[in-house]
C-alpha cells in the first residue's frame, strides 16, 4: 500500500495508524485517511464529496476533504484496490471538547446543505429498513430452527430471537405512531448525520470528521446512537454524562416532541442484537466467532437492564411525557 500511495499521490507514509475504523497516516501536520470504497456507488461518493466541501465552506476545519490523486481523480483504482484518501488538519482534541455542543453545531450547519441527497439519504426510511432487516433475520431464524443446530451460539440465537422480534415490532409501531400523531418542527429538518455516531467517531487524540461516516437523516439518529453506545460500554447509564450531553446539545438545538419520540423509537430498535448475530454468521474464523458469542452473552445478560433503561428514559432525561403528549410503553417492566 505504501508504494501504491506513493505512485498515485506522491506521498510516502512512514507508518500507518488507525483512524477510527479506517487506516491512515500523518505527514507533517496533515492527517490522511485511506477509505475502501469498493462497496460504495459513485453517486453516493459524489454526495459525500459535496457535503464535505459544503461543511468546509461553513468553517468546520475538522472536516476531512477528498484528496485528488496525481491524475486529478478522487477515486484511485488498482487491480486489487479501490479507495479514496481524505485529509484534514492533525489537530489534537481539546480537553474541554464537548460532544453535545459540537454535534449540535455540526447538525446546525448540515441542515443548511442546499443540494438534493438521494443515495446517502435515510430520512423517512427507518421503518422500511428495520422491516427488511427483521424479515431477513426471521427467515434465517426459521432456517436454523429446522436445521436443529447444536452449537451454543446458534441455540442462544434460536431461544432469544422471538423476544427481539417483539422488541423490533414495538420500535416500528412506536415510529409509525409518532409519524401519525406528531408533527415535525423546523428543528426536525434533515441534516448531515452519521451511520453510528459514538464517542470515537470524531477521533480520540485528534479531531476528524470523515465523510465516509455520513448519511443524511433526522438529527435524533446521532443522539440516540451516542446514548446507546454509552449504555453498551458498561451496560449502565451514566445519567450525569447523558444529562450533560443532551443539555449541551439543546443549548444550540432544542429538541421537539417529535425528535424525542424518534430518538426513543431508535433506542427501542435493538440494533446491537442484530449486529452481533449478523457478525457471527458473517465470519469464518473461530476466534472471531467466539468474540461474537461473548458479546451476545453480554447483551442477553443485561436485557432486563436495557428494559429498565428504556422504561426510565424519559424520566431520567427530565422530559414530562404528559406535557409533550408522549406515549409510554406499558409492557416494559
What annotation goes with each model-predicted range?
Residues 121, 257-265:
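All-alpha amphipathic helical-bundle segments outside canonical DNA-binding/catalytic cores
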Residues 30-119:
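ATP-binding pocket architecture of kinase catalytic cores
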Residues 1-29, 67-71:
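ATP-binding glycine-rich phosphate-binding loop
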Residues 24, 66, 174-223:
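Active-site acidic catalytic loop and adjacent metal/ATP-binding pocket
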Residues 220-254, 267-286, 293:
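Active-site activation/catalytic loop segments of kinase-like enzymes and analogous catalytic loops
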Residues 274-333:
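ATP/Mg2+ or Mg2+-diphosphate-binding catalytic cores
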Residues 15, 120-192, 294-298:
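ATP-dependent phospho-/nucleotidyl transfer catalytic cores
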Residues 69, 265-266:
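Short acidic/histidine-centered micro-motifs embedded in hydrophobic/aromatic stretches
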Amino acid at each position: 500500500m505504501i508504494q501504491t500511495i506513493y505512485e498515485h499521490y506522491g506521498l510516502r507514509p512512514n507508518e500507518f495508524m488507525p483512524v477510527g475504523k479506517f487506516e491512515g497516516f500523518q505527514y507533517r501536520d496533515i492527517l490522511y485517511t485511506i477509505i475502501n470504497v469498493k462497496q460504495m456507488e459513485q453517486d453516493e461518493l459524489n454526495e459525500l464529496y459535496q457535503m464535505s466541501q459544503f461543511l468546509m465552506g461553513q468553517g468546520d476545519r475538522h472536516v476531512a476533504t477528498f484528496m485528488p490523486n496525481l491524475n486529478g481523480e478522487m477515486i484511485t483504482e488498482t487491480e486489487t484496490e479501490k479507495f479514496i484518501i481524505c485529509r484534514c488538519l492533525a489537530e489534537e482534541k481539546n480537553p474541554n471538547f464537548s460532544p453535545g455542543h459540537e454535534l449540535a453545531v455540526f447538525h446546525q450547519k448540515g441542515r443548511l446543505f442546499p443540494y438534493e441527497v438521494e443515495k446517502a439519504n435515510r430520512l423517512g426510511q427507518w421503518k422500511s429498513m428495520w422491516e427488511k432487516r427483521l424479515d431477513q433475520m426471521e427467515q434465517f431464524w426459521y432456517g436454523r430452527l429446522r436445521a436443529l443446530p447444536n452449537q451454543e451460539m446458534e441455540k442462544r440465537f434460536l431461544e432469544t430471537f422471538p423476544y427481539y422480534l417483539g422488541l423490533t415490532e414495538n420500535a416500528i409501531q412506536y415510529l409509525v405512531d409518532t409519524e401519525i400523531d406528531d408533527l415535525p418542527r423546523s428543528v426536525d429538518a434533515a441534516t448531515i448525520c452519521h451511520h453510528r455516531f459514538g464517542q470515537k467517531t470524531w477521533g480520540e487524540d485528534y479531531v476528524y470528521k470523515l465523510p465516509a461516516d455520513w448519511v443524511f437523516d433526522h438529527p435524533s439518529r446521532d443522539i440516540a446512537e451516542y446514548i446507546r453506545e454509552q449504555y453498551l460500554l458498561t451496560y449502565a447509564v451514566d445519567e450525569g454524562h447523558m444529562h450533560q450531553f443532551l443539555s449541551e446539545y439543546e443549548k444550540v438545538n432544542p429538541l421537539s416532541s417529535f425528535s424525542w419520540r424518534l430518538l426513543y423509537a431508535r433506542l427501542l430498535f435493538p440494533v446491537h442484537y442484530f449486529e452481533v448475530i449478523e457478525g457471527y454468521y458473517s465470519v469464518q474464523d473461530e476466534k472471531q466467532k467466539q468474540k461474537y458469542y461473548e458479546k451476545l452473552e453480554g447483551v442477553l445478560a443485561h436485557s432486563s437492564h436495557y428494559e429498565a433503561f428504556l422504561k426510565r428514559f424519559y424520566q431520567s432525561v427530565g422530559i414530562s411525557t404528559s406535557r409533550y403528549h408522549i406515549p409510554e410503553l406499558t409492557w416494559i417492566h
